[in-house]
């Protein structure tokens, strides 16, 4: 029997090698893939913090997003109840706040107490009302049962940073008394702190060293993160040498479609060609950490990756010279700030976003030894998975991807071998399939995620578990749309939403519809 199975697998692989590997939309071809799940190898646990989120005081993420005291949809503390209910579906495990670039001009002291005053937001050229600060964020995290993750102003001195730690975590002292006076007698127990956002250079590294040392002396239980790699940069090896002993995480940021000045909306194939980029980016960070381990600057396994800003599309914020106060009445400034709202358009977020997000999360799961946190940026509005408007919410396509992964996958990742035809677009190509297999602790219940990236063709996928071709009918959930450009908006909020179905496998073969994400549940092999 084993010989027959191996023969079948060999035929499938040979057919993939000798068939036309170009799967352009202007020709009809047989699209095939082979997924082999190594059920005899030990599955490894992953950290659910890879399903985390990020909120910044930018656009309508905070004000007009999660927090809107004047809205009839808000509770008595100002939180939008519809937003809270939707985010609970994502079981958001951790939220990073308050930035992001915003944090470069943020002073935490302005966001606590009763007599808060508006300040100039030197990063984004708006007025920050400071009505949402430390305690409001903690209240949000408590509503969502999420771990708070604070990011320090990287331009502030170490004293300001440690004062915030004292205010948040101390039982007694000047800042603990201040917190108690503000209505919070018990420590806030904030455990994860980042020293700045997207900063670099020797002076910054020395600040990381000093701040990390100071924070851990105050509270030995805190976990320290710092800027490591963003965009096309590399981690400065000196960071590990000078500050490595105080670090628990290294931060990685990447957005794969650049929207900084010019708002762009590439087509489906252009977006899908980026699907394998996260894997190589993560491997790059892992290699740099491993080099530091080999050189003895850090202990093996000491530093994990916090991919604490990620998304297919970067934020759109054309503008002015930052770090300078602007004239808020200047028509040009008003025009530039208003232009940021282009990214709120629901029609932008289609199956590209849903399937790219699945591939990003698959990359995190495959590399879960090192990557233990990831935060989609942002969680709400701009390019985030949840669009919030004055009268309600819209769950964008990638909202459903995250919701499916959080609620459908099991807790351990199994090694999986994937062989598939290539999907091409000009000189670029990616595998037509992506897959991840998860299993429960007892090794009995499986949840397998299968992504067909092809825009227009069904994918004939052969699934082998160990040495056994999968046969039978199993419960599944599928996310797709009528076309690659399908999206959700106010008038049509459910054009792209998960559907339950029964999926039939015969001799290991299952048909996956085009531009789709499918998670299938298997309880007996």
Where do the protein language model's features map onto the residues?
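Active-site cores of enzymes that catalyze phosphoryl transfer or operate on phosphate-rich substrates
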Residues: 246-249, 257, 268-276
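Bacterial Sec-dependent N-terminal signal peptides
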Residues: 1-30
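Non-catalytic accessory regions flanking glycosidase/transglycosidase catalytic cores in CAZymes
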Residues: 23-235, 240-249, 278-279, 283-316, ...
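Active-site His/acidic residue clusters
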Residues: 254-270, 320-322
């Amino acid at each position: 029997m084993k010989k027959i199975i191996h023969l079948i697998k060999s035929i499938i692989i040979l057919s993939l090698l000798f068939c036309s590997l170009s799967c352009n939309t202007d020709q009809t071809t047989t699209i095939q893939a082979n997924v082999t799940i190594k059920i005899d190898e030990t599955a490894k646990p992953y950290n659910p913090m890879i399903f985390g989120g990020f909120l910044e005081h930018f656009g309508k993420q905070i004000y007009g997003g999660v927090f809107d005291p004047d809205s009839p949809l808000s509770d008595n503390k100002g939180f939008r109840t519809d937003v809270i209910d939707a985010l609970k579906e994502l079981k958001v495990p951790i939220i990073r706040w308050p930035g992001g670039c915003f944090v470069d001009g943020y002073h935490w002291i302005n966001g606590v107490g009763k007599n808060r005053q508006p300040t100039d937001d030197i990063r984004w050229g708006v007025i920050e009302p400071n009505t949402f600060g430390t305690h409001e964020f903690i209240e949000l995290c408590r509503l969502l049962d999420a771990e708070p993750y604070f990011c320090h102003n990287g331009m502030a001195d170490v004293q300001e940073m440690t004062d915030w730690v004292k205010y948040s975590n101390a039982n007694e002292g000047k800042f603990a008394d201040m917190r108690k006076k503000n209505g919070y007698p018990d420590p806030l127990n904030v455990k994860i702190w980042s020293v700045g956002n997207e900063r670099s250079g020797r002076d910054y590294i020395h600040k990381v060293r000093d701040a990390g040392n100071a924070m851990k002396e105050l509270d030995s239980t805190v976990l320290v993160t710092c800027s490591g790699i963003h965009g096309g940069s590399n981690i400065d090896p000196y960071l590990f040498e000078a500050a490595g002993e105080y670090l628990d995480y290294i931060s990685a940021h990447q957005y794969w479609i650049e929207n900084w000045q010019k708002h762009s909306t590439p087509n489906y194939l252009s977006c899908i060609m980026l699907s394998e980029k996260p894997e190589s980016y993560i491997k790059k960070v892992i290699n740099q950490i491993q080099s530091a381990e080999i050189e003895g600057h850090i202990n093996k396994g000491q530093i994990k990756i916090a991919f604490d800003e990620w998304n297919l599309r970067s934020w759109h914020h054309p503008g002015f010279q930052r770090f300078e106060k602007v004239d808020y009445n200047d028509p040009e400034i008003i025009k530039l700030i208003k232009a940021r709202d282009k990214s709120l358009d629901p029609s932008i977020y289609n199956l590209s976003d849903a399937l790219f997000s699945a591939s990003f999360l698959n990359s995190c799961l495959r590399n879960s030894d090192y990557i233990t946190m990831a935060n989609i940026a942002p969680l709400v509005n701009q390019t985030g998975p949840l669009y919030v408007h004055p009268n309600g919410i819209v769950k964008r396509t990638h909202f459903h991807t995250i919701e499916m992964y959080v609620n459908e996958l099991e807790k351990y990742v199994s090694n999986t071998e994937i062989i598939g035809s290539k999907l091409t677009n000009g000189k670029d190509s990616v595998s037509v399939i992506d897959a991840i297999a998860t299993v429960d602790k007892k090794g009995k219940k499986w949840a397998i995620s299968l992504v067909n990236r092809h825009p227009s063709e069904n994918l004939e996928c052969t699934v082998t578990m160990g040495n056994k071709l999968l046969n039978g009918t199993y419960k599944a959930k599928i996310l797709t749309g009528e076309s690659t450009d399908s999206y959700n908006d106010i008038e049509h909020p459910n054009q792209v939403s998960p559907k339950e179905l029964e999926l039939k496998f015969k001799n290991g073969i299952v048909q996956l519809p085009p531009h789709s994400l499918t998670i299938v549940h298997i309880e007996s092999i």
